[in-house]
Design a protein with these regions (language model features):
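A charged N-terminal "starter" segment
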Residues: 1-128, 170, 174, 201, ...
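Active-site loop/helix belt of alpha/beta enzymes
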Residues: 137-218
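Glycine-rich, aromatic-flanked loop segments that form ligand/cofactor-binding clefts
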Residues: 127-139
């Protein structure tokens, strides 16, 4: 097959095996969790519109980190309610575009983003769902360049920096999500479980204060 394609098209080119993609998707969708869950595909991993369209048709959501990725997710058919916006490098344009598209959640990485999202949402007569990326101060025991859950890092917000009561009173936003990501290429699953437990404990504590979190984003 590959030789036939090489003869038909000029090289170089990317060749994707649809059967393998669908096999991986089915494996994930068949995992038996004891709670409601949904996988979100990181668009940065492959922004090819045909691939995104295929993934969208298998009940996946999309995770984006820029206005360009959000545009591609929408163009490939993802419903805004199934798109989350992550990343520490959001521009004002990114935020404005995400707000007007009314996506599932904009996960903030610093408290200044909250003020901007609230004010812009109010100016447009909208209420925007946000999440807060929590920095749980848990080491992923991976390479220094890709560990992201320790205090003092550039990713996420520490527990003690967040005034949840004040955030819950803002009229232009709704805090719906708590998010965390302590790093990549982690081989010690105990650290991952520990970080998940910290997020669950935080969500339970907020519920006791009357602040209901709808989604935990791992």
């Amino acid at each position: 097959m590959i030789n036939k394609i090489i003869n038909e098209f000029s090289t170089p080119f990317y060749l994707y095996d649809e059967n393998i993609i669908e096999e991986k998707i089915r494996f994930l969708n068949n995992l038996n969790f004891k709670f409601d869950s949904k996988f979100h595909f990181a668009v940065k991993a492959n922004p090819n519109l045909a691939i995104l369209n295929k993934i969208n048709h298998h009940n996946f959501g999309a995770e984006v980190v820029s206005a360009g990725e959000l545009f591609k997710a929408l163009k490939s058919g993802f419903d805004p309610s199934n798109i989350i916006f992550d990343g520490p490098g959001k521009t004002e344009f990114d935020l404005k575009y995400a707000i007007t598209q009314q996506i599932k959640s904009i996960n903030i990485e610093n408290l200044e983003e909250i003020d901007f999202i609230n004010e812009y949402s109010l100016s447009k007569g909208l209420i925007t769902n946000i999440g807060i990326r929590i920095n749980p101060n848990i080491d992923g025991y991976t390479l220094d360049k890709i560990t992201t859950g320790k205090t003092g890092g550039k990713f996420g917000v520490s527990f003690d920096q967040i005034d949840f009561d004040s955030i819950s009173k803002l009229k232009g936003i709704k805090l719906s999500t708590l998010s965390e990501h302590i790093g990549s290429q982690i081989t010690d699953h105990h650290q991952l479980i520990k970080s998940y437990q910290e997020l669950i404990i935080l969500a339970d504590g907020l519920l006791k204060k009357g602040i209901s979190i709808e989604t935990l984003d791992f």
